[in-house]
Design a protein with these regions (language model features):
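Amphipathic alpha-helical segments used for helix-helix packing
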Residues: 1, 13, 46-54
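Amphipathic alpha-helical packing segments from all-alpha helical-bundle domains
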Residues: 1-24, 31-36, 62-73
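Short, flexible helix-adjacent loops and helix caps
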Residues: 24, 49-53, 79-80
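Alpha-helix initiation/capping motif
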Residues: 26-28, 56
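Hydrophobic alpha-helical segments that form the core
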Residues: 28-50, 62-71, 84-95
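DNA-recognition helix of helix-turn-helix
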Residues: 54-58, 72
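Charged, low-complexity intrinsically disordered regulatory/assembly segments
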Residues: 77-106
Length: 106
C-alpha cells in the first residue's frame, strides 16, 4: 500500500548525505530541511495536478528558492532551530528590531 509519508522518509534517507555534504549541516538539520521543502513542493504539486495553480514557472521557482533560502538561513543562524529548541518570541523580536543580536536557545 502506498504511503506518502513512507515515500518521503525513503527519499529523505537517500538525499540526507548529499544535503549534509553540500550545505554542511547535521543529519538532523538535513532531515528538517528536506521535510519542510518536501511539504512545500507537495503543496504546490496539489495546485498543479488539480489545474488550479495560479503561478507561472518563474513564480514557482522564486517561491521554492525563497523557502529553500529561508529554511537554510534559519538552520544556520538560529541555534536550535531544526530541533525546535529556540525561543520563538525572541527570534521574532530580534527580526522586528526589538532585540539586538541572535535569539537565545531555550
Amino acid at each position: 500500500e502506498y504511503s506518502a509519508m513512507a515515500s518521503m522518509r525513503h527519499l529523505q534517507e537517500h538525499v540526507r548525505p548529499t544535503l549534509m555534504r553540500i550545505y554542511r549541516i547535521t543529519a538532523e538539520e538535513a532531515d528538517f530541511y528536506f521535510r519542510d521543502m518536501w511539504l512545500v513542493v507537495h503543496s504546490l504539486a496539489t495546485l498543479i495536478v488539480t489545474n488550479d495553480c495560479p503561478y507561472s514557472d518563474e513564480e514557482l521557482a522564486r517561491l521554492l528558492t525563497g523557502f529553500s533560502v529561508s529554511i537554510y538561513k534559519a538552520i544556520r543562524e538560529i541555534p536550535g532551530f531544526a530541533a525546535g529548541a529556540f525561543d520563538r518570541d525572541a527570534v521574532f523580536r530580534a527580526l522586528a528590531g526589538g532585540d539586538e543580536g541572535k535569539a537565545p536557545v531555550k
